[in-house]
Every structure is written in C-alpha cells, then in structure tokens.
Amino acid sequence: MQLYNGVGVALLTLLHSDGDVDLGATADLAAGLAGRGMQAILACGTTGEPAMLTVDERRDVVAAVRGAVPAHIPVIAGTGAPTAEVAAGLTADAIEAGADAILAWPPAGSADLAGYFAAVAAAAQGRPVLAYHFPKISAPGVPVEALATLPVVGVKDSSGDPNRLLEEITRYPGDTYTGSSALLTLCGPAGGAGALLAAANVEPELCIAAFAGDG
C-alpha cells in the first residue's frame, strides 16, 4: 500500500530566540501546511536540522507534529544516524511518539546497507520505512539496484540527478519520491509517487502545481 501520493513537506523545526525548540510554532506550521494541501509531513528530516536536536527534542517534535495534523496525513520521522544501533533507537523513539513512517539515510560509506535497514525496519515495528538517497550528506548513498533488496517501501531521492530519478521510477517497484524541487515537473509526469520538499514550507501550492505538471 502506497504511503502517500503527491507532495509532502520536509518540515522546518522552528526555534525560540534562545535556541530552544518552539514546539507550538512547529506544530502550527505543520497544521497550516496540511491545510494547504500537503499529503505528508516529514519531521526531523535533514531540513529539520536533527543533528542540532537532543533525542528528547526529536521525540517531542514528532509528537507535536502528529498531534497537530489530521490522522489521514502521515507523519514521517527522519531517523538516519551514523550507526544502525543509533538509528534503531531513534526509530523506536519516533514510533513511540506517534510517527506513521520512517525516513532513514545510511551512514557515509556504509558497506552493510542490508544490516542497517534491517535494524531500522525491526525498530519501526511494521511501520513503513523509506530509504533516503542524499549523497551530499551520506555518500555514496543507496544504489538503485540495492533498493529492491532492502526492507523499505520506497525511496526519497535528493540527489538532484534526473537520470537516476527516472531509473528509480522505471526500474524500482517501490515508491519514488523526489526531494529536489528542480525535478518536480519531471517526477510527477514520469510516474513518481510524490515529493518531500523543503520548498513546500514556503510555497506549498506552487510545489503541488509543479508536481501535477501545471507549474
């Protein structure tokens, strides 16, 4: 079953002037974007600066966002980490906080993608897991040919590589979501499942139109 179809937002984590997380403002942002047509909310993805948050703050952000948006809109939690053990712990925390799905990026240079994603999937307790291909933060990323061998339902691709995106859409049987706003007009018409975008924090309607081929 498809996690969602269309455009989702890679949510910003809003802060108070002293640097503490502003849970209320972050939740309000999520609720407002859900009301403007977002089909999924990604909390604590790379746009949400998870490396700056404590484990408790990450859990609190997920819980606040889940409580702020309608139940039919999936809340996806970012749980990528340098080791499988840490990623599994973050995943378990996110599920406990109410996450409906998980987005995990592998460690840089990871030679054991299968073991890493198996640990994340086990901690997700049956919730869907998306692999995150973003070689700028975690090189070399997830090879297209590896995707079908992993316990994931889809991939978010933020590489910005149009050829790779088309290869994922045509060769990989799971769902392909682009993380690149520049590829929105390609992803939708080519048959991609959707997008998870930072740009949707400020221009959700334009992102929706672009994915639909109207941008």
Mark where each language-model region is.
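Active-site beta->alpha loop and helix N-cap motifs at the rims of alpha/beta catalytic domains
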Residues: 1-139, 144, 152
